[in-house]
Amino acid sequence: KAFLRQPTGIGWKVQGKRWFWLAAWFGPAVLTLLGAVLYFAVFPSRLDFSGSWLVAAYGGEMDAQTLRSQLGVSTLSYLLQNGLFAVLLAPAINMFPALGEEVGWRGYMMPRLKERFGLLNGRLLGGVVWGVWHWPLMLLVGYEYGTDYLGAPLLGLVVWCVVCFALNTLLDILYEKTESIWVPAIAHGAFNAIAALPQVLVTPADAYYNVLGPMPIGLIAALPMLAAAVWLTLREMKQEEKN
């Protein structure tokens, strides 16, 4: 790859087909939506529009009706306002804090893992390494799923590695196809912006099931992202065999 021959080994140019930039910007929102729909299709009783999550988020001092009448905050308004911000503006903002991880994981680690272990094994190993990197925070402070959740702490550690494989693969594909580290940085920033939004649709008590969904870091809600990662990797492997 030409970008590996650059002095830093990282592709810094703003380049690549428009399709990949659009996929990076809007793809995480689409996958998050699909994951939430799948989760609530499996667990329809957990879909909650009462505003109980908002009540807890605002400190519990006002009930849902008071939040609507005095502050104009409802589940629908929260989803619309924060969803529009997360989709339209946040990827550009979050791109910069995400850039550091992208330089390290996708820019430096992934090309070398794929060169040594092959496409599929490299992406599998890269996802596990990225996931395990977060384990200390997960065990010490409840990063991602909290400390009291279904199957804690073992299930969360395993699920997080599955999620990291899926996300790492999609980010790696974006970098591979564009040779520009800015593209996966945008996608990473977009994912960080939108991922927590489905949580407003469950009660605080259902945070116990966060390891399953409705956020795309849950096993069930992550299935669309995982399916996309596996399908794209298998397609890429078939193309390599033909060549």
Q: Which residues does each predicted region cover?
A:
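Membrane-helix interface linkers and caps
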Residues: K1-G27, L38-E61, P97, R112, ...
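Residue-level signature of the transmembrane alpha-helical core
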Residues: W25-A29, V87, P91, M95, ...
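Transmembrane alpha-helix/helix-exit interface in multi-pass inner-membrane proteins
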Residues: A36-D48, E101-E102, R123-Y143
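Membrane-interface interhelical connector segments
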Residues: M62-Q70, M138-A152
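Hydrophobic alpha-helical transmembrane segments
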Residues: A64-N94, L157-L167, P214-L223
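Membrane-interface helix/loop boundary segments of multi-pass membrane proteins
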Residues: L99-V132, D172-S180
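Kinked, hydrophobic transmembrane alpha-helices enriched for aromatic residues
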Residues: V129-V141, P184-T203
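C-terminal membrane module of polytopic membrane proteins
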Residues: T147-G156, G189-N243
